[in-house]
Design a protein with these regions (language model features):
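C-terminal cap of thioredoxin/glutaredoxin-like
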Residues: 2-4, 16-28, 54, 105-193
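Aromatic-flanked redox-active Cys/Sec active sites in thiol-based oxidoreductases
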Residues: 5-10
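Structural alpha/beta surface segment adjacent to cysteine/selenocysteine redox centers
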Residues: 15-113
Length: 193
């Protein structure tokens, strides 16, 4: 069984889905391949005020109940940001064997601490917390080395019609949006038979 996840750090559904997929991966001993997919490349790195539309309020309310199920004290940031630097740093963290720690801390920094993960200083601090040398990470981010990997993920996502994040692929079976742990288990059971 192969599991691939397309995710973005500014998507609260990716945050929830990530936790659930990590649980499933651990439960079944399946290594998960994580692929960063930037859903809003047009957003500025300094952030953009989150609009308070009826839809946004309803989404926040439904997220709140799901977060409570996950026992997360969730608070939707009042802004949205550009996740590119954080996604590039996540790719770099893979080369250091620190991906899951970095990945989880990116979500926590944005959704629990309301930090701007589009800001390079924040990204470097996250790296430092998980044991990645700040100077090395900064050099890598400035080099743009990981941008090519993200671009290859984007091309792949468009080719296989990833419509949003999270998108979880079990072998060749694609699931859009966050699902319950039970749903993920039933998908794995289906492919195990």
């Amino acid at each position: 069984m192969e599991i691939t996840v397309f995710y973005d750090y500014i998507c609260p559904f990716s945050f929830i889905g990530s936790r659930r997929i990590q649980q499933i991966g651990a439960e079944y001993g399946i290594e998960v391949e994580w692929k960063g997919y930037q859903i809003h490349p047009e957003y500025p790195t300094q952030g953009k005020k989150r609009r308070q539309t009826f839809r946004a309020i309803r989404t926040a309310e439904s997220l709140q109940s799901v977060m409570e199920e996950e026992e997360i004290k969730f608070k939707l940031p009042g802004f949205v940001t550009n996740s590119r630097l954080c996604l590039e740093a996540a790719e770099f963290s893979k080369t250091k064997g620190k991906f899951i720690e970095f990945h989880n801390l990116c979500y926590e920094s944005y959704f629990l601490e309301r930090k701007n993960i589009g800001d390079q200083d924040i990204v470097l601090a996250i790296g430092d917390k998980v044991g990645i040398d700040s100077d090395e990470l900064e050099f890598n981010l400035k080099s743009g080395e990981m941008a090519g990997i993200l671009e290859s993920y984007r091309v792949e996502a468009e080719k296989i019609e990833v419509l949003g994040v999270p998108t979880v692929i079990f072998n060749d079976f694609r699931v859009h949006g966050v699902q319950s742990v039970e749903t993920y288990r039933s998908i794995i059971a289906k492919f195990s038979n």
